Amino acid sequence: FHISGARGRLHYEKSAADQHGIPGCGKGGREMSIKLIALDLDGTTLNSAKRISERTCVALETAAKQGVHIVVATGRPFAALPEDVFHIHAIRYMLTSNGAAITDLSSGEIFYENCLSAGTVEAAVEMLKSTDYILEGFIAGKAYIEKAYYEYVERTGKSFRDVRYILETRNPVENLNGFLLNHKDHVENINVNFEDLACKPGLRDMLLTLPDATITTSFPNNLEIGGSTTSKAEALRQLGKKLGIRREEMLAAGDSPNDIAMLQEAGIAVAMGNGEEEVKSIADYITSDNDHDGVGEAVEKFVLKV
């Protein structure tokens, strides 16, 4: 193994991991038992076709039969979750909108919410209303977008991201800014999307001046505004308390900057082979990419011990 990253965490290549027998060991090399697996979706559990591979499905179902909790932790709102996650019976808890809500699928109960404050929503709308960025609002589990942009995507087949995903998961409204203000007590996230990557640094600096807000990103062409304490990590902490599971008993996997805090919260942090370098730099293990069963591989190695 070799040491890298600002925190000096151990990065194990596959051959070194096998050689040194690390599966099942937490930070510090102590033998541990994983009781909860937290998984990002896009770029992690989902492959490029937005499906969950058979190997990963089998690994998750097998882990669940051994009593391990399988948790989705995604930047998507609940209504935008792919069908595949509902076909895996092992998955019970959904952490959505970057941790703004936790839903128990067994009962349909949303037992945790951490939305933006009304004041932050007002400030964000005021800041962004004169810009031409493409805005999305996640409100009570649904995603909303300007009707004019939605119709543009329908008409041209062009979008800042997957066209089919936009048309199937976004709800068009006439005036998104007004809609956000009318629902300012229930806004989970505001996403700012752009086509020119050169805009990102300046836009990020601007958004960082918002009061009581967290700014993160899940793919190159966006920035995401959440509440001051909203994150996948905080939601995972709250779920751990509810289930009586310590952070040392958790494994988390992700690929993007909005996964970093969650990976740092878990006993074993797994970065995808296709993940961004800043994610890989804080991981305990770098697995295969999302098109080569990276999640299934990590679950087999650290949980199933195969």
Residue ranges and their predicted role:
Residues 67-71, 90-92, 189, 248-249, ...:
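Short active-site oxyanion
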Residues 9-14, 18-31:
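Short, Lys/Arg-enriched N-terminal segments with co-localized hydrophobic residues
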Residues 127, 131-133, 138-253:
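Conserved acidic, metal-coordinating active-site core of Asp-based
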Residues 51-160:
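Active-site phosphate-binding/coordination module
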Residues 32-36, 53, 208, 223-306:
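Mg2+-dependent phosphoryl-transfer enzymes with acidic/Ser/Thr/Gly-rich catalytic loops
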Residues 50-66, 113-120, 172-177, 227-241, ...:
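Short, acidic loop-to-helix structural element flanking the phosphoryl-transfer center
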Residues 35-48:
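Asp-based phosphoryl-transfer active-site loop
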Residues 1-10:
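Extreme N-terminal basic, low-complexity initiation segments
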